[in-house]
Swiss-Prot record:
One of its GO terms (biological process) is actin filament depolymerization. Residues 904-1070 are annotated as: Important for interaction with RAB8A. The modification Phosphoserine is found at residues 793, 875-876, 1060. Residues 671-684 have a biased composition (Pro residues). Residues 921-1070 form the bMERB domain. It is an enzyme of class 1 (oxidoreductase). Monooxygenase that promotes depolymerization of F-actin by mediating oxidation of specific methionine residues on actin to form methionine-sulfoxide, resulting in actin filament disassembly and preventing repolymerization. In the absence of actin, it also functions as a NADPH oxidase producing H(2)O(2). Acts as a cytoskeletal regulator that connects NEDD9 to intermediate filaments. Also acts as a negative regulator of apoptosis via its interaction with STK38 and STK38L; acts by antagonizing STK38 and STK38L activation by MST1/STK4. The gene is MICAL1. Its cofactor is FAD. This is [F-actin]-monooxygenase MICAL1. Zn(2+) 1 binds at residues 697, 700, 718, 721. Keywords: Actin-binding, Coiled coil, Cytoplasm, Cytoskeleton, Endosome, FAD, Flavoprotein, LIM domain, Membrane, Metal-binding, Monooxygenase, NADP, Oxidoreductase, Phosphoprotein, Zinc. Residues 695-757 form the LIM zinc-binding domain. Residues 876-887 have a biased composition (Acidic residues).
Length: 1070
């Protein structure tokens, strides 16, 4: 039947319509189709029914079935839910078209205006599972056969617009091209309607079109008047996108895509890139669609060094303006990074062309995010109401093209259509606005993990998409200002001052309140009399009493008597840091001397904000640290625990550190950690001569103000100084080391080995030209771009002769790669010392599987699963496609993939193999997306902390220098300083929470990579392995054991923290 050549012209037009790849071709073929059928285009759902009835064509039936299935959902009321509602949609981007499709299915008349005349954006969008299912339900595979057929689920913006345009045309949406919306024309008198101001001169019918709903999807640069947009900025992030011609050769199709490589948890790739090409990146992604699409975040200094930017301007717009960007250098930069990431396997990279015929490569500002403060408004003039809604980038302009833009854009389109439905049902303006704003509050928090799992049930009704939905979260009284009944001046797009931090919780209202709280907490202790916030704390007893009140088990009150002032203060400072998460702001010496009263007030305010809700009865406090202190405390313990685990696994000397964090009260230590000698390059002699420890930075020697102080191991630093010398990442106490040779600080990953000079090439060349051809920059590093954990193998410690290298036999290796983790007793050799490594390996792989949540199944269960797969493989192609739509649980898909590899099922069922491979890639992408979101927030926190430090420095200088200022003014300044301290503590706590998540991601990624690498070695024939292969396999096994132990330590600490916080909740204690 498919081979029969049809002579019906409507059939030919329909085929052209399906295959059209240019906007004008789509429009002309659709006009031809309507002409051949005698149907007037743009007639709403009635046009769709006429086309469907008259086009009796076999190739159209599957498309009609999909659209009819969607339209048959009860929410649309058979296309009569919004009959009589007239809508104007501005913008034919993906979100505008998706909103138009929903409105058309509701039965509204929809007119769409677009200022462009063609689709030319090649950039590729990552898709969430629900967007894939949604687009397939609209016939995406019919319009674009390669939709989501690769290892990653994505689509180019141009292809997405084309398929949505085709659906919108079929559903009767009236579309006008080359028309720019410039504003609204209110009704001149009662009984008339709202119109649009359009340029250039629109058709007469469009100029007279009166509508009662406006949906703006015109992008972030245009927001209708009346809406206020807030700008959120973080640390400068320069994004570069590049599209290269995809020749679709066999060689190109075999190059694997890169779902995401982020410096935040995987740095070896970027160090290799820097050494090979001089390019310094934060992250890179590679998608293969109509083009080879690369997106990366580059560092400004690298762009300046390589001549991509002419000059360094403080203003971002001027920095990245066309006059300051060198196009040829930018092209070399993008080509070299792309060639390195793909190991030169794409051949000669030729840039695709943009809408202006130029090479499709650009640099732009990733720093700014725009977010509308409200998603909808109602305007009323002369008794005629107009409902305005925002979708797409003019509602929320996303930071990173990883699916959040199109996914949340589709959600916003659904929510806007639901709002129009409620409007058409006659709900009051304030009720409609309140519901819409309640949904808008959820939008920025949505992710595939916190929405309903069954994407097949998603529909227009918000309850099908959002769990725990509360449509009354915003009340009608809270949205009165969004109901405009009077003429107002246009509200221009504005950028508010950024406050990236969360609102400080528990801020101290005054010094009197802080003093009163301290007196309540220390009341009843012998010898403790708190009368002020300075001299009362000099003997150390008051601080010990405060710590004891919050942690009674650490010390008996009687033991406070007899302690010296310095001894007691040092003990209290250490206990507060290690057990309460309160980092020091001043040294024990300064506290005893009373030389820094401002620092003492700031330090005590941290106790107040963290524990102000704690009752002051002795022994009433649980082991949990509430508020901001908990995250900082947990991160410190985590860093020390992971480092101790690494040290024990590597057989290294732990430096005499005790395994427990507690310091015995009987022998309190007043010794400070070793301070670098004066002749070391980073420590000035003045530190040990004239100033106290907290007044000068231990690295740069410059003055430290209160809000700049960061304490680690008894020393104080600037935050900007306390960074890894190699990767410049912010360090945390317990997660760094100072090299005894050069005096620099290093994160644990980049700490040079003792006795070896640091390789200066790790930091990259000071000045290096970009390679002019792909042959010059092909790395000789890892074989695949995602094997980023490979590097210099750790050298076995020669002073640990008992840790010998154990070689496993071939049967043992096969058992390690098997899911049957219990060996056959008959095959198990007699126990002997060398077999302890085999046992550890079994435990490592078992823990590796359990770390993913994978159950150890019996052979009967595995056989049943294989039989079930055989039954599924006999289904039709359409059923197979729908099966792939259902998102697999990440743990189960890991289990299935390993099962398939070891049982040979993967080769027998290629569809299953492709599905599992794609799902594995999706899990990798989820980690990358999460890492990118964390990186973005960390940048925002860093920018906010710098701003707080600058404001705090001004206040502190004013307090210390203006001795003649009125006492009332000084008290006001102190209160402002305390508020800044609380905001800083809140931001630091959030930063600690993010760093904990980074540790999880890092270990999860390492375990996944090592597991895959170990299985690669085990699947080889033993007779084909070289000595180097066996040595590498043993090293990978040791690394896997190390990572498994670290993840185990992290899970134990997280469980301890959870139980501790649970015990501290009201109603749980006692």
């Amino acid at each position: 039947m498919a081979s029969t050549i049809s002579t019906n012209p409507a059939h030919a037009h329909f085929e052209s319509f399906l295959q059209a790849q240019l906007c004008q071709d789509v429009l002309s073929s659709f006009q031809g189709l309507c002409g051949a059928l005698g149907v007037e285009p743009g007639g709403g759902l009635s046009q769709y029914h006429k086309v469907k009835a008259q086009l009796n064509y076999w190739n159209a039936k599957s498309l009609w079935a999909k659209l009819d299935k969607r339209a048959s959902q009860p929410v649309y009321q058979q296309g009569r839910a919004c009959t009589g509602t007239k809508c104007l949609v501005v913008g034919a981007g993906p979100c505008g078209l998706r909103a138009a499709v929903e409105l058309a299915m509701l039965g509204a008349r929809v007119v769409l205006v677009e200022k462009r005349t063609k689709f030319s954006r090649h950039n590729v969008l990552h898709l969430w599972p629900f967007t894939i299912h949604d687009l397939r339900a609209l016939g995406a595979k019919k319009f674009y056969g390669r939709f989501c057929t690769g290892s990653l689920d994505h689509i180019s913006i141009r292809q997405l617009q084309l398929l949505l345009l085709k659906v919108a045309l079929l559903l009767g949406v009236e579309i006008h091209w080359g028309i720019t919306f410039t504003g609204l024309q209110p009704p001149p008198k009662k009984g008339s309607g709202w119109r649009a101001q359009l340029q250039p001169s629109p058709p007469a019918q469009l100029a007279k079109y009166e509508f009662d709903v406006l949906i703006s999807a015109a992008g972030g640069k245009f927001v209708p008047e009346g809406f206020t947009v807030r700008e959120m900025r973080g640390k400068l992030a320069i994004g570069i996108t590049a599209n290269f011609v995809n020749g679709r050769t066999v060689e190109e199709t075999q190059v694997p895509e890169i779902s995401g490589v982020a410096r935040i948890y995987n740095q070896s790739f970027f160090q290799s890139l820097l050494k090979a090409t001089g390019i310094d990146l934060e992250n890179i992604v590679y998608y293969k669609d109509d083009t080879h699409y690369f997106v990366m975040t580059a560092k400004k200094q690298c762009l300046l060094r390589l001549g991509v930017l002419h000059k360094d301007w403080p203003d971002t717009e001027r920095l990245l303006g066309s006059a300051n960007v060198v196009p040829e250098a930018l092209q070399r930069f993008a080509r070299a990074a792309a060639d390195f990431a793909t190991h030169g396997k794409l051949g000669k990279l030729e840039f695709a062309r943009d809408a202006h015929g130029r090479p499709d490569v650009s640099a732009f500002d990733f720093t700014s995010m725009m977010r509308a403060e409200s998603s909808a408004r109602v305007q009323e003039r002369h008794g005629t109401r107009l409902l305005l809604g925002l979708v797409g980038d003019c509602l929320v302009e996303p930071f990173w093209p990883l699916g959040t833009g199109v996914a949340r854009g589709f959600l916003a389109a659904f929510d806007a259509a639901w709002m129009v439905k409620r409007w058409a049902e006659g709900a009051g303006p304030l009720e409609v606005l309140a519901e819409r704003e309640s949904l808008y509050q959820l939008l920025s928090q949505t992710s595939p993990e916190n929405m309903h799992r069954n994407v097949a049930q998603y529909g227009l009704d918000p309850a099908t998409r959002y769990p725990n939905l509360n449509l009354r979260a915003v009340t009608p009284s809270q949205v009165r200002d969004l109901y405009d009944m009077e003429a107002k001046e246009p509200v221009q797009r504005m950028s508010d001052e950024t406050d990236s931090g969360k609102a400080a919780t528990g801020a101290v209202g005054s010094q009197e309140e802080l003093l009163r709280w301290c007196q309540e907490q220390t009341a009843g202790y012998p010898g403790v009399h708190v009368t002020d916030l300075s001299s009362s704390w000099a003997d150390g007893l008051a601080l010990c009493a405060l710590v004891h009140r919050l942690r009674p088990a650490l010390l008996e009150p009687s033991e406070l008597q007899g302690m010296g002032a310095l001894e007691a203060t040092s003990w209290a400072l250490k206990m507060a840091e290690h057990e309460l998460g309160i980092t020091p702001v001043l040294s024990a010496q300064a506290m005893v001397a009373g030389s820094d009263p401002l620092g003492l007030i700031a330090y005590l305010s941290h106790f107040h904000s963290a524990f102000k809700s704690v009752p002051h009865n002795p022994g009433s406090v649980s082991q949990g640290s509430p508020g901001t202190a908990s995250a900082v405390l947990f991160l410190g313990k985590l860093q020390r625990t992971l480092q101790r685990t690494r040290t024990q696994e590597n057989g290294e000397d732990a430096g005499g550190k005790k395994p427990r964090l507690e310091v015995k009260a009987e022998t309190p230590s007043t010794e400070e950690p070793p301070v670098p000698k004066p002749d070391e390059p980073m420590t000035p002699p003045s530190q040990q001569q004239d100033a106290s420890a907290e007044d000068l930075c231990a690295l740069c020697g410059q003055h430290l103000y209160i809000l700049e102080r960061l304490c680690a191991d008894g020393r104080f630093f600037h935050r900007s100084c306390f960074r890894c010398h190699i990767c410049e990442a912010t360090l945390w106490p317990g997660g760094y080391r100072q090299h005894p040779g050069d005096g620099y600080l290093y994160c644990l990953q980049h700490l040079p080995q003792t006795g070896h000079e640091e390789d200066s090439s790790d930091r990259g060349p000071e000045s290096q030209d970009l390679p002019m051809s792909s042959e010059n920059n092909t790395p000789s590093g890892p074989a695949t771009p995602v094997d980023l954990h490979q590097g210099t193998s750790p050298v076995p410690n020669p002073i640990q002769p008992t840790r010998r290298l154990i070689r496993l036999s071939s049967p043992e290796r096969q058992r390690l790669s098997s899911l049957h983790l219990t060996p056959d007793p008959e095959m198990e050799p007699p126990p002997k010392p060398p077999r302890s490594c085999s046992t550890l390996a079994h435990q490592a792989l078992e823990a590796s599987f359990k770390g993913w949540g994978m159950p150890v199944q019996s052979p009967q269960v595995l056989e049943a699963m294989e039989m079930g797969e055989e039954e599924r493989s006999s289904s039709s192609e359409e059923e197979t496609e729908e099966e792939e739509d259902v998102p697999l649980d990440s743990d189960m898909e890991h289990f299935l993939r390993n099962l398939a590899e070891n049982s040979g099922t993967m080769n027998n069922y290629p569809t299953w193999r492709r599905t599992l491979l794609r799902r594995a890639k999706e899990e990798e992408m989820k980690r990358f997306c999460k890492a990118q979101a964390i990186q973005r927030r960390l940048n925002e926190i860093e920018a906010a902390l710098r701003e707080l430090e600058a404001r705090g420095t001004e206040l502190e200088l004013a307090l210390r220098s203006q001795s003649s200022s009125p006492e009332k003014q000084k008290a006001l300044w102190v209160e402002q300083l305390l508020q800044l301290v609380q905001k800083k503590n809140s931001l630091v706590a959030e930063e600690a929470e993010l760093m904990i998540t980074v540790q999880e991601l890092n270990l999860e990624e390492k375990q996944w990579q090592l597991d895959q690498e170990l299985r690669t070695y085990m699947n080889r024939e033993e007779t084909l392995k070289t000595a180097a292969d066996r040595q590498a396999e043993d090293q990978v096994l040791r690394k896997l054991l190390d990572v498994v132990n670290q993840r185990d330590a992290l899970i134990r600490l997280q469980e301890e923290r959870r139980l501790s916080e649970l015990a501290s909740e009201p109603g749980v204690q006692g």
